[in-house]
A protein has these predicted regions:
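Gly/Ser-rich "nucleophile elbow"/oxyanion-hole loop immediately N-terminal to the catalytic nucleophile
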Residues: 72-76, 126, 131-178, 196
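Short beta-strand element of the alpha/beta-hydrolase
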Residues: 64-67, 76-86, 97, 106
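N-terminal cap/lid segment of alpha/beta-hydrolase-fold proteins
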Residues: 20-76
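Surface beta-strand/loop "capping" patches
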Residues: 306-347
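Primarily recognizes the serine-hydrolase "nucleophile elbow" in alpha/beta-hydrolase
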Residues: 102, 156-228
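Catalytic histidine neighborhood in serine/cysteine hydrolases
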Residues: 269-286
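Cap/lid segment of the alpha/beta-hydrolase catalytic domain
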Residues: 91-153, 205-217
């Protein structure tokens, strides 16, 4: 499904806690190493960022990141890719190197607060915290107590650093993320508006208050705290500013980001958007284009083709299915497909609910 182009994004509110970090190139504090191998130059470094504290104050920190690019980019302007790791992950070189081999300049930062905190090479408060601590908590005395402030700020600063690279075309910036990284690219796409051209979200979502990881924690907060947390940290509240062409790959039986939150996220994206649900799997996509092998360094095999489509201005056009209104008799469902490729095949998956309600993870989808 794809929507018409939206109007220019509204300005980010001046008092938004992320406004100071949405623009401006962060200082590279340390270059740890540089190496060229197999036609790819890999730079490992730390850059200046910000983190919160138990006292609700903002402090300085340093974020570890890996930048990969083709070995010789002199005189070139290449597309840029921000690679966001998932929950329990950290910056790793596999993704950036894979994108560099496809002609991108790519950056993969630590995203402290939802990663492998104790293994990260960042200089951050979270390296002494357990994974999952202080993510979805009452924002008291200020929202800066929440470690998602650290993570989102690191993502913003990494994007700004990528955008400033001399061999990067600032008009061709994209981002990809898996799980919590899918949350991150959704959040950043809203905060960064027209600066992001294409976004791929594998399994993540916004609208945590509906049916996603952290929903129970949000329900336990009092209303004022919950509303503050959602305003500051829920990716769904940011999507009115998103202007990226968006592709969501989600699992219909996901245990973490379930269809109600995923569909609310999709509906809130005001511009070009596509979605695909994989049946009978949690946090895995079994359909063509998904992560069919775990050692694949890019999150899903459809990504290179999707981003090539975005950066080519939407060419060639992707298939767009549209439902056709028919008289319902329990057996007929019709749809048309615009831009349908030759020899295409289509099929339906249906979930029949029993008398007793069943959670999304336990549904059976029959083809």
């Amino acid at each position: 499904m794809k929507c018409a182009a939206a109007a220019p994004a509204p300005a980010l509110e001046k008092d938004d806690l992320f406004a100071p970090y949405a623009k401006g190139v962060p200082k590279v504090t340390t270059v740890i190493s540089e190496e060229t191998k197999d036609g790819v130059k890999v730079t490992k470094l730390r850059f200046a960022s910000a983190e919160g504290s138990k006292e609700g104050e903002v402090k300085d920190c340093e974020i570890y990141a890996i930048i990969a690019r083709p070995a010789n980019t002199a005189g070139q302007k290449l597309p840029g890719m921000l690679v966001c790791h998932g929950g329990g992950g950290m910056a790793s070189e596999g993704g950036p190197i894979a994108w560099a081999k496809l002609g991108y300049v790519a950056i993969a930062p630590d995203l402290p607060g939802y990663g492998a905190n104790d293994k990260m090479l960042s200089i951050s408060r979270v390296t002494k915290m357990q994974f999952g601590a202080d993510q979805i908590i009452p924002p008291k005395p200020t929202p800066y107590v929440c470690v998602l402030f650290d993570a989102v700020t690191a993502g913003l600063r990494a994007f700004n650093l990528l955008e400033a690279q001399p061999d990067v075309d600032p008009q061709k910036l994209c981002m990809t993320g898996i799980s919590w990284g899918g949350y991150m690219v959704t959040m950043l796409s809203g905060l960064l508006d027209e600066r992001v051209k294409g976004t791929f979200n594998l399994y993540g979502s916004g609208f945590y208050q509906l049916d996603a990881i952290g929903s129970d924690a949000l329900k336990k907060m009092d209303e004022a705290d919950r509303n503050t947390w959602l305003k500051c940290f829920d990716a769904g509240t940011r999507l009115n500013r998103c202007r990226a062409t968006f592709l969501m790959y989600s699992a219909a039986n996901d245990a973490f980001f379930k269809p109600p939150s995923v569909m609310a996220t999709f509906d809130a994206i005001p511009v070009g958007k596509y979605i695909c649900f994989g049946p009978n799997k949690s946090h895995y996509m079994s359909l063509p284009g998904g992560p069919v092998r775990w050692e694949y360094p890019i999150n899903a095999e459809i990504e290179p083709a999707f981003f090539a489509h975005v950066l080519a201005g939407g060419n060639p056009p992707l298939p767009e299915p549209n439902a056709v209104a028919v008289t319902r008799n329990g057996k007929v469902l019709k749809f048309t497909v615009k831009n349908c490729p030759d020899r295409a095949a289509g099929w339906f998956y249906v979930s029949w609910l029993p008398d007793q309600p069943r959670g999304w993870e336990a549904r059976d989808w029959a083809r």
